[in-house]
Amino acid sequence: MEEKKFHNFKNKKFSSIAWIMAVLVIVIAVILNMIVSQLDLGWDVSPNKQYSLGKTTTAYLDELDQNGTKIDFYVLAKMDDIKDSVDTLALYRALKEYDEHDCINLIDIDPNSDEATMEKINPDNALTLNTGDMVLVCGDTKKRIPGNTMYTTNSDDNGNAVSQTFNGENILTGAIKSVVDGFTPTVYFLTGHGEKSADDNYTQFKKNLQNYNYAAKSLLLSDVDAVPSDAAMILVAAPTSDISDSDKDKLDAYLNEGGNLSLLMSPNAGKFNYTNLDLIMEEFSIIMDYDTVKETDASMHVSGDDSTIQCNLVELSSDSEAADLTSSLINQGLVPYMTNSRSFYFDTDTTGTLTTAELLTTNDTAVGEPNGGAYDTKKITNSELMLAGYSQSNTKNNAKLAVFGNADFLDDTHLQDSRYLVAVYLYLSTISWMYDTDVDMGIDSKSTVYDEISLPDANSARSLMIVFAALPVAIIIIGVGVWVKRRNS
């Protein structure tokens, strides 16, 4: 009898201790959770440290802290909204870690209600800003970062997301370095040869360039010894006369160092050749026709205007560095138009050290009618004519040349016409391909893989849900039964 009492006393003692320990664990967990919530602490236990900044970023930010550098980092969304979405958690954690450094002044705003701040960061409305975008400002240098560049989502054949890659750290740290260095790449509009004016004809396009983080300026080569060092590209828009020998020498020197040139060569009825520009194009195996392209199929041109024609985007090889120039536009099923254009072709006998590709071509019902030039030429028929193309020279430090047969589609008048938007986007893509404004810090992207269970039908799904619901209940019942049995034993 005494032994049984002792046994019951021992069971009660152990049960009491167990209950006390359980209560203590719950109390401690609640207190710790409250502390962590108040301090907004977090531990990154992901395999690839997806929610932590890497050594490259932290070392660079530490250096800026020591130098006393200050960057205003505007986020066009409230941090609480970013935090609440699982899809943007990596971005939220990155922004929080950036903000821990003295050099970063993180300012999150609601772009729809904070008009004063929006006016401050975009006073002339040059930037097209959307919710989720970011703007970095350091001194007089400003850079826009589209929010949709932070992630890349990969889907399966059924459109289901299978993985998500966070690209944000490399982009954001590179953008910080860009504004700290105070370097803004510039698109220079060549002048002095009757070209269309950046200030008079391309005011909206200049704003588009700013939106892509380029500056836009005019350049008269006769006033300088060489092309400026901040040149991302030289743009020549519809010159009415050839460039001089001296101008050609300066452009040659620029291209030999890996420069970028874009020629928008609208048809010109003048009875002369663009001798020096032709020579530059020939070095890239591009031959310019002295013609005006017209469409003979009435269903392929604007009613009453056979020189405003429907044309075709050319799909580039998937392993080409320039594949993205046309792929996204083609995938959207967009139909391009071009107006009053001349044509070009490649000299295939001289393309050995070059990478060349057509970007925009006509249908084979179009013709090239002779127009201008020092010599009589024949009409070009029964051929798909090239209206835009590019060439990259391996012997000139990867210098790039892009040609378009018209300069009007970018001007203030035509930019309002939706028919030319595809050509405009294509042209902007060539600029980004020639000179990417993003500074690559060499920081790897971080991936998240979504696990999923494939079930054959709804009945299987219901059965699985019942199992998931019943299993914990069964475990609890068994546990209680064991406890009761031990208590009464």
Task: Annotate each language-model stretch with its function.
Residues E2-S489:
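Short, surface-exposed patches at the edges or C-terminal ends of soluble domains, predominantly
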